[in-house]
Amino acid sequence: TDKDGALDELFKIKEEGLAKAVGLAMGRIDIMFPILKNWDFDVIINHNRYTLLNREADEMYSYAHSKNISIFNAAPYAGGVLAKGPSNFKKITYQDASEEKLAPAREIERVCKKYNVEMGAAALQFSMKDKRITSTICGVTSVQSIEKNLAWAKTDIPEEFWNEVLKLPFSTKDPESERVYTAG
């Protein structure tokens, strides 16, 4: 981010017509948002910070949208728990989660069961229905998971469901703040 650094060079490449767009991709909002405010990016990708469980990226997404920056929201399933359900998958954003940390996901699961809505459909459409978000990026591991994502994207979800699920509490803290990274 220094003058004459990598970002300067990327924007020069765009000015010279060698690239059509310059984007910024990262997880940590505390690093990403200040960079975003100081450069004229065309697109951003952020992951795990705008889900049914977490809205840490909300302010940054509003800012980016106001600047006509395309927003790609990745990992709408919070690392899998919102696709598989907290009864089957006891991790949030790739980390083992205590019962206390799983409680908000269990509340979402409860509302999903009440309205007969699959959690994955709710999580995916939460991102897809946000007008600020240009596209939602989902990790897939097989043809079956692609088919499931496509089905979830087309699922009819009643407005009553959204009215209830959007009233549930959510975090605005970095969901990976306690994540331990190991080499290899």
Tell where the protein language model's regions lie, with residue ranges.
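Beta/alpha (TIM)-barrel catalytic core signal, keyed to glycine-rich beta->alpha loops juxtaposed to Asp/Glu
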Residues: T1-K167, S171-T172, E178-G184
